[in-house]
From Swiss-Prot:
SUPFAM superfamilies noted in UniProt: Ribosomal protein S6
Family: Belongs to the bacterial ribosomal protein bS6 family.
GO CC annotation: cytoplasm; ribonucleoprotein complex; ribosome
Entry function: Binds together with bS18 to 16S ribosomal RNA.
GO BP terms: translation
Name the record gives this protein: Small ribosomal subunit protein bS6
Signal peptide: none
Domain of life according to the entry: Bacteria
Coiled-coil region list: none
Length: 97
């Protein structure tokens, strides 16, 4: 990897997803990171929480936070594919340091 950076991803998934479905969804996206030569820490599942305001007709969501290292293009692609999934209500990727 030439220019890998550290990132923190938080996404909010549909509250209707059970624990197994949420883990499967998370693993699907983290595969993209490893396939492109990146690495990640163990995902932190915060569970179902009330949203500050309604998003896409939902008042609750399953929160997941993952720290990972990847190239900027991989991070951009991860954000793009997360936003295409209807089970993902909101995403935020922050570059760390």
């Amino acid at each position: 990897m030439m220019s890998a950076h550290k990132y923190e991803l938080m996404f909010i998934a549909d509250p209707e997803l059970d624990e197994r479905g949420l883990k499967k969804l998370t693993e699907q996206y983290l595969e993209l990171v490893t396939k492109e030569g990146g690495s990640f820490d163990e995902p932190d599942y915060w569970g179902r929480r009330k949203l500050a305001y309604e998003i896409a007709g939902k008042t609750e969501g399953n929160y997941v936070v993952v720290k990972y290292t990847a190239e900027p293009a991989t991070s951009d692609e991860l954000d793009r594919v997360l936003n295409l999934n209807e089970s993902v209500i909101r995403t935020k990727i922050l570059r760390k340091g």
